[in-house]
Curated annotation (Swiss-Prot):
Residues 59-70, 112-125 have a biased composition (Acidic residues). The modification Phosphoserine is found at residues 61, 89, 718, 723, 733, 736, 738, 781, 797, 845. Residues 541-557 have a biased composition (Low complexity). InterPro entries: G_patch_dom (IPR000467), Nucleotide-bd_a/b_plait_sf (IPR012677), OCRE (IPR041591), RBD_domain_sf (IPR035979), RBM10_OCRE (IPR035618), RBM10_RRM2 (IPR034992), RRM_dom (IPR000504), Znf_C2H2_type (IPR013087). Residues 858-904 form the G-patch domain. This is RNA-binding protein 10. Residues 1-14, 21-45, 98-111, 623-639, 653-669, 700-709, 743-753, 815-826 have a biased composition (Basic and acidic residues). It comes from the Eukaryota. It comes from Homo sapiens. The modification Omega-N-methylarginine is found at residue 902. Disulfide bonds: none annotated. Its main location: nucleus.
Length: 930
């Protein structure tokens, strides 16, 4: 049965060709009543088109606002075909008005046309594993859809009903996602593209997801994924036209397969272990010469991008389980506050940078890439906040160094584990790679302390064995060596066949079992040991048989430095007796506080030079500095000595003032004093490690003055000369008799605590690069002030100490200076009263609050004014003296108000006292009662 189109509101007003339609419509159509049984007033989403194009809607216009994972395309083939067919029709699609008024329209179409459309949809729709259900009832839920799936024996991966965000009501369509395309196709064919849910027919369509490659683009320079509207890369700033790279979604530039023998590795990264090399994949990012290293933002946190909005914590942990042991405390999924769905990224925080770098390298080396819930994951280092980026340049350099070496350490650990854990270095035909840029001169390990020094070491690949610097085929390691700095001074090196260092008191001695446990490489190949300088004779150890170690030569014997592998802190062994860490590869002892190495054989302190890749004695740079300065002239010496004496006196005065202020404090005086005889021998030893530790702290104040400065300090020789007279520290008191003696003996004693030639403070055991730094240390350092006070108290006798403590206790008490001043000068006489200018005025004091208590006198201003007009005292006012004689007195207001209130007062005035007022009140009440 064919239904005629009824005119809408626009047709009645003649908006869209009402005149033409009046010729087709008969009179009975205009007079026909509405048959509401044939009408469908449901407000489900529908599509309609108009010639103007301003009312073209499709299903995706309502789906895209709430859909996050299933982004339907705005124009599918079926919808475009329908639009073309509707445009060719002269009157538009049957059953749809042109003006948008569809309250009294019939939405049913002919059966033949509907079947034709269904056939076209079946032919033109592209199969997908996501099925869209349209025309759902308002009361339908996800459970109803799952019930339909279970009735057909189909297991769906996810069912999502689209709802209005504000009201929460169903929008009439839903999505069903299947794990496989075959399941979705089988379900569509079994139901003939329609379902019956809650007694209503529901249409089924394949979802046409929007290709995301048209939305985002990848930068072929840095590999960062950018938004579609971004015209240039937000990381490297390359324009989109130059840097756009058509790659599948989720594919990263650093995940492309490179040839196994490729040399284009990112600086600071080592090849992956053998299992990944077998697959032909190198986990390194190909960076251009101008690009920044990938370790710039390295930290202990990894970010996972391009996550499915419905991915949960369990799915992420399950996907990462084969690569790392993580818990829910390590993973943080960022969710939307309104929808409670994740925003497409998550963070993984590990305990150290090494673990994070290791996991990052593994995940980026996967082929195919990591996939979670059907989406390819992009893995990168997480960037810090803006306030973290605002750090100074020195800390950034140090952080970059630690991050680079951490990545190298992670890769080296993987490679060592894959090779069986024999502890041998990997042999290779390619030349050794230079990683000396890890060791920054000023930033290396200065601000990170002990923890950073554990990781801030590079790992060298390509050498024949640990510590081997010779050419291939030369087992003795005596082959030609290339120096990194041809013009640099040489340091003596000597190779020996077995590492068997001698032991000193408190120094670790390697046993024969420990030597043999290092593998066969330690026996067949040689180590290279530095010959450091002697710093202190007290550190000399008892002689032990050490014939395997030849005597060291002078530092100027060679012109090139022997190169060593970068120290591996993880292989060090802790020695409880000395407190140092023993390096079994080089036989040196490592101090983590100062980062110095100690050679027990030559009793020298060494430090690691990253540029030369060798161990340099601590005295080398200071000796060079003295050679360059040369011998000063005679006039320069005199000026220097004069300036030195003047500076010492100023420092002595400053320390004297500080000592006086220190006497006011009671705390830690007894604990700070320790006799010299009670100190242990090891506490009295001078150590260059303290110099390096203080240089790290001193670096913040004078960074420019401390470049390439050796932290050398000779020992304090015992002085056999008689000590100067001992006296008390000058106290803050004008009655101290020993103040003058202390002023004479103090500067001479303190002058001996400073070595102006070597620019060292012998009291604090510190050496400085310039005289200004030494003076600043003596004036401002709290450590120097504390050591100076301890040094002064150490030279006092017991009686002097008791007197000093007694004086300190007296100083801690309250001192009544006013009483002392009164006793000394007496009590001053009170000042004389001031003389008044006018003697005629009575000096009697008048209470300003009660001036008329005794009555009005004749000296007031009112009386004088009346007398000026002819009035005399005692007469009445007026022309004929008929007025009042006595002045009007002020009376208290009537107490009380309303009915029953007395009409008179008790005769009490405001000038009466409380006692007089009470007396008058009692008398008045008594009289009234009678």
């Amino acid at each position: 049965m064919e239904y005629e189109r009824r005119g809408g509101r626009g047709d009645r007003t003649g908006r869209y060709g009402a005149t033409d339609r009046s010729q087709d419509d008969g009179g009975e159509n205009r007079s026909r009543d509405h048959d509401y049984r044939d009408m469908d007033y449901r407000s489900y989403p529908r599509e309609y088109g108009s010639q103007e194009g301003k009312h073209d809607y499709d299903d995706s216009s309502e789906e895209q606002s709430a859909e996050d994972s299933y982004e339907a395309s705005p124009g599918s083939e079926t919808q475009r075909r329908r639009r073309r067919r509707h445009r060719h029709s002269p009157t538009g699609p049957p059953g749809f008005p042109r003006d948008g008024d569809y309250r009294d329209q019939d939405y049913r179409t002919e059966q033949g046309e509907e079947e034709e459309e269904e056939e076209d949809e079946e032919e033109e729709e592209k199969a997908s594993n996501i099925v869209m259900l349209r025309m759902l009832p308002q009361a339908a839920t996800e459970d109803d859809i799952r019930g339909q799936l279970q009735s057909h024996g189909v297991q769906a991966r996810e069912v999502r009903l689209m709802r209005n965000k504000s009201s929460g009501q169903s929008r009439g369509f839903a999505f069903v996602e299947f794990s496989h395309l075959q399941d979705a196709t089988r379900w569509m064919e079994a139901n003939q593209h329609s379902l019956n849910i809650l007694g209503q027919k529901v249409s089924m369509h394949y979802s046409d997801p929007k290709p995301k490659i048209n939305e985002d683009w990848l930068c072929n320079k840095c590999g960062v994924q950018n938004f579609k509207r971004r015209e240039k890369c937000f990381k490297c700033g390359v324009p989109k036209s130059e840097a756009e790279q058509k790659l599948p979604l989720g594919t990263r530039l650093d995940q492309q397969t490179l040839p196994l023998g490729g040399r284009e590795l990112s600086q600071g990264l080592l090849p992956l272990p053998q299992p990944y090399q077998a697959q032909g994949v190198l986990a390194s990012q190909a960076l251009s010469q101008g690009s920044e290293p990938s370790s710039e933002n390295a930290n202990d946190t990894i970010i996972l991008r391009n996550l499915n909005p419905h991915s949960t914590m369990d799915s992420i942990l399950g996907a990462l389980a084969p690569y790392a042991v993580l818990s829910s405390s390590n993973v943080r999924v960022i969710k939307d506050k309104q929808t409670q769905l994740n925003r497409g990224f998550a963070f993984i925080q590990l305990s150290t940078i090494v673990e994070a770098a290791q996991l990052l390298q593994i995940l980026q080396a996967l082929h195919p890439p990591l996939t979670i819930d059907g989406k390819t994951i992009n893995v990168e280092f997480a960037k810090g906040s803006k306030r973290d980026m605002a750090s100074n340049e020195g800390s950034r350099i140090s952080a970059a160094s630690v991050a680079s070496t951490a990545i190298a350490a992670a890769q080296w650990a993987i490679s060592q584990a894959s090779q069986g854990g024999e502890g041998t270095w990997a042999t290779s035909e390619e030349p050794p790679v230079d990683y000396s840029y890890y060791q920054q001169d000023e930033g290396y390990g200065n601000s990170q302390g002990t923890e950073s020094s554990l990781y801030a070491h590079g790992y060298l690949k390509g050498t024949k064995g640990p510590g081997i610097t010779g050419t291939k085929g030369d087992p003795t390691g005596a082959g030609p060596e290339a120096s990194l700095e041809p013009g640099a001074d040489s340091v003596s090196m000597q190779a020996f066949s077995r590492a068997q260092p001698g032991a000193a008191p408190g120094i670790y001695q390697q046993s024969a079992e420990a030597s043999s446990s290092q593998g066969t490489a330690a026996n067949s190949q040689s180590y290279t040991i530095m010959s450091p300088a002697v710093l202190k004779s007290e550190l000399q150890s008892p002689t032990h048989p050490s014939s395997a170690l030849p005597p060291a030569t002078s530092p100027t014997a060679q012109e090139s430095y022997s190169q060593y592998p970068v120290p591996d802190v993880s292989t060090y062994q802790y020695d409880e007796t000395s407190g140092y860490y023993y390096d079994p590869q080089t036989g040196l002892y490592y101090d983590p506080n100062s980062q110095y190495y100690y050679n027990a054989q030559s009793q020298q302190y060494l430090y690691w030079d990253g540029e030369r890749r060798t161990y340099v004695p601590a005295l080398e740079q200071s000796a060079d500095g003295h050679k360059e300065t040369g011998a000063p002239s005679k006039e320069g010496k005199e000026k220097k000595e004069k300036h030195k004496t003047k500076t010492a006196q100023q420092i002595a005065k400053d320390m004297e003032r500080w000592a006086r202020s220190l006497n006011k404090q009671k705390e830690n005086f007894k604990n700070s004093f320790q006799p010299i005889s009670s100190l242990r021998d090891d506490e009295r030893r001078e150590s260059a490690t303290a110099d390096a530790g203080y240089a790290i702290l001193e670096k913040k104040g004078a960074l420019a003055e401390r470049q390439h400065t050796s932290m050398d300090l000779p020992k304090l020789a015992s002085d056999d000369r008689p000590s100067p007279p001992r006296g008390l520290v000058a106290a803050y008191s004008g009655e101290s008799d020993s103040e003058e003696e202390q002023e004479r003996g103090g500067p001479e004693r303190e002058e001996k605590l400073t070595d102006w030639q070597k620019l060292a403070c012998l009291l604090c055991r510190r050496q400085f690069p310039s005289k200004e730094a030494l003076i600043r240390h003596q004036q401002l350092s709290g450590l120097h002030k504390q050591n100076l006070e301890i040094h002064r108290r150490a030279h006092l006798s017991e009686n002097e100490l008791e007197a000093l403590e007694k004086n300190d206790m007296e100083q801690m008490k309250y001192r009544d200076r006013a009483a002392e001043r009164r006793e000394k000068y007496g009590i001053p006489e009170p000042p004389e009263p001031k003389r008044r200018k006018y003697g005629g005025i009575s000096t009697a004091s008048v209470d300003f609050e009660q001036p008329t208590r005794d009555g009005l006198g004749s000296d007031n201003i009112g009386s004088r004014m009346l007398q000026a007009m002819g009035w005399k005292e005692g007469s009445g006012l007026g022309r004929k003296k008929q007025g009042i004689v006595t002045p009007i007195e002020a009376q208290t207001r009537v107490r009380g108000s309303g009915l029953g209130a007395r009409g008179s007062s008790y005769g009490v005035t405001s000038t009466e006292s409380y006692k007089e007022t009470l007396h008058k009140t009692m008398v008045t009440r008594f009289n009234e009662a009678q």
